[in-house]
Each structure stands twice: as C-alpha cells, then as structure tokens.
Curated annotation (Swiss-Prot):
Higher taxonomy: Bacteria, Pseudomonadati, Pseudomonadota, Gammaproteobacteria, Pseudomonadales
Family that this chain belongs to: Belongs to the LpxC family.
Pathway noted in the entry: Glycolipid biosynthesis; lipid IV(A) biosynthesis; lipid IV(A) from (3R)-3-hydroxytetradecanoyl-[acyl-carrier-protein] and UDP-N-acetyl-alpha-D-glucosamine: step 2/6
EC number from the UniProt entry: 3.5.1.108
HAMAP family assigned: LpxC
Binding-site residues, Zn(2+): H78, H237, D241
Its biological purpose: Catalyzes the hydrolysis of UDP-3-O-myristoyl-N-acetylglucosamine to form UDP-3-O-myristoylglucosamine and acetate, the committed step in lipid A biosynthesis.
PANTHER family, alphabetized: UDP-3-O-ACYL-N-ACETYLGLUCOSAMINE DEACETYLASE 1, MITOCHONDRIAL-RELATED
Reactions that this protein is recorded to catalyse: a UDP-3-O-[(3R)-3-hydroxyacyl]-N-acetyl-alpha-D-glucosamine + H2O = a UDP-3-O-[(3R)-3-hydroxyacyl]-alpha-D-glucosamine + acetate
Gene Ontology CC: one annotated term: membrane
Active site annotation, chain numbering: H264
Protein name as it appears in the record: UDP-3-O-acyl-N-acetylglucosamine deacetylase
GO biological process: lipid A biosynthetic process
Keywords of this entry: Hydrolase, Lipid A biosynthesis, Lipid biosynthesis, Lipid metabolism, Metal-binding, Zinc
Amino acid sequence: MIRQRTLKNTIRATGVGLHSGEKVYLTLKPAPVDTGIIFRRTDLDPMVEIRACAENVGETMLSTTLVKDGVRVATVEHLLSAMAGLGIDNCFVELSAAEVPIMDGSAGPFVFLLQSAGISEQEAAKRFIRIKREVTVEEGDKKATFLPFEGFKVSFGIDFDHPVFKGRAQTATVDFSSTSFVKEVSRARTFGFMRDIEKLRAMNLALGGSVDNAIVVDDYKILNEDGLRYDDEFVKHKVLDAIGDLYLLGNSLIGEFRGIKSGHDLNNKLLRKLRAEEDAWEVVTFDDEATAPISYMKPVLAAG
C-alpha cells in the first residue's frame, strides 16, 4: 500500500525571517501516524502548537500565515510545498520565532533538509483527497479551480506588464506523473519588485529580503547577478506556492489545480469552498501502489 511518511531523524537549520529580518531556529522532527504537520512556537511559554490546515489560515497578504488564539506562524508555504513534494504526512516543525525562515526563497533548502533527515514509511495507509467535480472561486480577473484528474497536476498563469516578463513564459503546467517536483519546481525562488520592497520596508516588512533569498526586479531588469534558475522561474514559483497552499488540505491531492493570477488568499478560499462542498471530494487510500495514480520517490532514493 501507499503508506504515510514522516522523518527518520530530527534535523535543525537556522535562517532569517523574510519579513521580520530576525534570526530563526528551525527544527523538523518525526511525528506519529495521523499527526499531520504541526507547527510549534517553542519561543513561547507555554509552547503553542498550530496545525497546518486551511481553517487556521489567518492572513494571506504577503504569505500564508497560520493563526491560533492570536499566535502566528508566517510564511509556511515553501516548507509545506517541500513536504507535499516529498509526500511527508506527519512532522513537528519547531520555530523560535513567528516566521518560517526564508532560506534562499525557494523550497530547495527544505527539500535538502527533509532528505538529509531521511524519510520513513509508517504502518498506516496514506490518505489522499480525490477531486470528484469542478470547484471554482473567482475575484475580478483572478481565478482558482479544482478539477478531477487521475494524478496531480498544477497549471498557473501570471500576467505582469513589465519589461522583464516580456518574452518569458507566464504560464506553466506541471503534471507530477512525468515531472519531478524536486528538479523542476522546488528551486524556483520568490520574486519581488524593488519599488514594492521599498514600500514594504517603510511598513517594517520584507526586512530580511535581499538578492540572497529572492529574485529582485527593478523597473527594467533582474538585479540578481546570476540571473534565473529556470527560464520560467517566475511562474514556476507560483506553482510552488500553490502546492504549499494546497497542502493545507491536510492530505495529498488527486486532481488538478488551475490558477490564473491567484495568490495565497484565493487559494485558501478555494480550499475552504472545497471542504464545504462534501460531494466534490472523497478520501481514498491505495492498497496496491502499482494501481495508484500517484507515486513518490522511494525513501532510499529520496536521499540522492
């Protein structure tokens, strides 16, 4: 059967918060079957636990932020994207601050950490959410949709009227039966416009942001010396963000997500709408890996 997964070992890392600019200590720990992904604010006494689920999303202005009883954990989407890509069901994420460290602005460092910790298959079937019919949310020219699909596919379209985006792909479709999340998506970095960053800093936000952890664009060009990691890195990062946001369903998806100019807010509204429409989805498990529409890297290979 396809089994639930957790980490073999505890692993630690240090980084800075994108918005706070503060140093953050991150610890990823194995968790029992059916735990889910649980964030822990270990800097608080008593420690506060916040489950990674759509209902706990409290803010979506610049990142996806989980909130419980006034306690926040911001910028969870890149770490959750890595968890989704590697099929990690159960994990404790301990943080010394109110924000997940930004690392290099992609999910790549989190993939490396998870693979370094090792992946352990557990004695319980992995539960998937299978989309049974279309569910859509729209706001103006933004749209987010779930569709039935035997596998997992993410399509995204962005539309920036800016010299850097001219002639670059602003759409991407990734079918994960034939495309590696680790190779093709996980390394895409977040991006920001210099003019926006200046405004954010005036509001005490993006204080940790730099060319070390984002693609920074001025009015004409990319400021990062090494350029882009993928030709379509901008839209690929939106795919990465969406995968992280969708993992707040609490299970891996069997279905297709299509986003047009969608962001964290609309993604979350789509999750809540899906949850409310119980005839639009079902929970499934697979006794036989060979017949399943989704497969994951073998835990041994995941360390490669």
